[in-house]
Amino acid sequence: LLAEWVKGGGALIMAGGYLSFQGFEAKARFAGTAVEEVLPVTCFTHDDRAETPEGAVPQINDAKHAVLAGVPATMPVLLGYNRVQLKPGATLIASVNGDPLIAATQVGKGRSLVWTSDIGPHWCPEPFVKWEGFAPLMANMITWVAGK
């Protein structure tokens, strides 16, 4: 139902976390589902968590994408994310340790986007949440998938 809705013009954002994508002990089980079908990424079939307690610095891959409009070019460190693989034809907007952090795609008449870290406060620590670019980034992701 969700996949058909997105293809028909709906919007989907999937954020990371312990029970997102494949998640802790692969218990989230999004690999091979209709949800994965409309994502810009493919999920692994095993525990996909990448814990980076030392901090991992996100890299901008598509600075001109609307999701990054008004967002500072340098992001604070993240403490983890879910590892996924970019699908052919999807846009890699930002990455962390070479893995997709923000990716987006058009799906039929709709759009989907992933943010593979969580939204806080676990992998997305307080300095990231308080960073001046956090609110615009989150707002831009919503605006982009909504087609505005």
Question: Model features per residue range: what roles?
Answer:
Residues L1-G17, F30, A34-V35, R83-K148:
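A glycine-centered loop/beta-turn motif at secondary-structure junctions
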Residues A11-D99, A104:
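An acidic, glycine-rich "communication" segment
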